[in-house]
């Protein structure tokens, strides 16, 4: 292994990828399109672009809990490990820099989530989980951690003075700058953007109560440092390049935003952190295809 490369770890929640239908073909404007996950995109970029000279992927860590009935239900189409002939979040034979991606998977289950929110021992359980996660990151030698779709808030792991302070970055499917009219923080970022394109703002996610607002028909993605807030860390790169149609479905918008904003933000953010300034305008080299290009390719596929 090239010791000059920065060692990457990737942390995600399979239950989030399952909600996105990662690794599946989804309905799209009367046709079908493949839902590539940010992880699969990153692997392609490491294999086929200059990012591969700067980084090596050492581990993919997921926090899903096989002992939780809720988690089992959410990932039931996939399971917690690939089974021959079954669905998976990416092509099961996928390799990254000469190694099978499936061989890099590590589960660090966030079992504290089984406890009620007001349980007295829940904070200690969360602390124990973060300690286990830190141990795993240290064991695999992680020097930079990319977080994508992790459905929990990290706290102790990202505090100043800890080994991974400012070494953990999040790729978020929305603009996270509070001063932006396109700001979409939190777990509902994509749905929030979809409502915004219809001239509505959800003011209560429990009841889905809305109020009218001026139409905001663009969204994007932010690549930012992690702190212990909700998508509140310092922004490294923003990409605002996703047009929203008022009739888009959530998966159509997800597909568009991945392709047009999130994948470029991930590429450009990692390039900037590696000091590869000349690559910042070269995210197209990572084979991010526009919606029209991808649609033409897949229409031809399904017409065969």
Where are these regions (language model features)?
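One-carbon transfer enzymes
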Residues: 1-304
């Amino acid at each position: 292994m090239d010791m000059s490369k920065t060692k990457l770890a990737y942390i995600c929640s399979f239950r989030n990828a399952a909600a996105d239908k990662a690794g599946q073909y989804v309905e799209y404007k009367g046709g079908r399109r493949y839902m590539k996950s940010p992880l699969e995109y990153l692997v392609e970029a490491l294999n086929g672009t200059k990012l591969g000279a700067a980084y090596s992927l050492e581990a993919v860590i997921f926090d899903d809990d096989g002992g939780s009935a809720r988690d089992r239900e959410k990932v039931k189409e996939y399971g917690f490990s690939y089974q021959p002939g079954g669905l998976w979040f990416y092509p099961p034979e996928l390799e990254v820099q000469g190694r099978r991606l499936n061989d890099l998977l590590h589960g660090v289950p966030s079992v504290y989530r089984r406890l009620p929110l007001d349980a007295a021992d829940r904070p200690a359980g969360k602390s124990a989980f973060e300690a286990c996660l830190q141990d795993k990151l240290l064991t695999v030698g992680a020097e930079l951690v990319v977080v994508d779709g992790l459905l929990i808030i990290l706290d102790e792991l990202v505090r100043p003075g800890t080994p991974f302070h400012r070494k953990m970055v999040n790729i978020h499917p929305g603009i996270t700058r509070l001063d932006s009219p396109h700001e979409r923080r939190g777990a509902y970022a994509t749905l929030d953007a979809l409502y915004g394109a219809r001239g509505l703002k959800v003011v209560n996610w429990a009841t889905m109560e809305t109020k009218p607002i001026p139409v905001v028909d663009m969204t994007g993605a932010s690549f930012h440092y992690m702190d212990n807030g909700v998508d509140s860390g310092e922004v490294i790169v923003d990409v605002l390049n996703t047009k929203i149609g008022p009739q888009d479905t959530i998966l159509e918008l997800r597909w568009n935003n991945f392709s047009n904003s999130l994948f470029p933000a991930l590429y450009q953010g990692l390039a900037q952190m590696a000091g590869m300034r000349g690559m910042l305008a070269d995210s197209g080299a990572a084979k991010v295809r526009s919606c029209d290009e991808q649609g033409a390719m897949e229409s031809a596929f399904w017409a065969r």
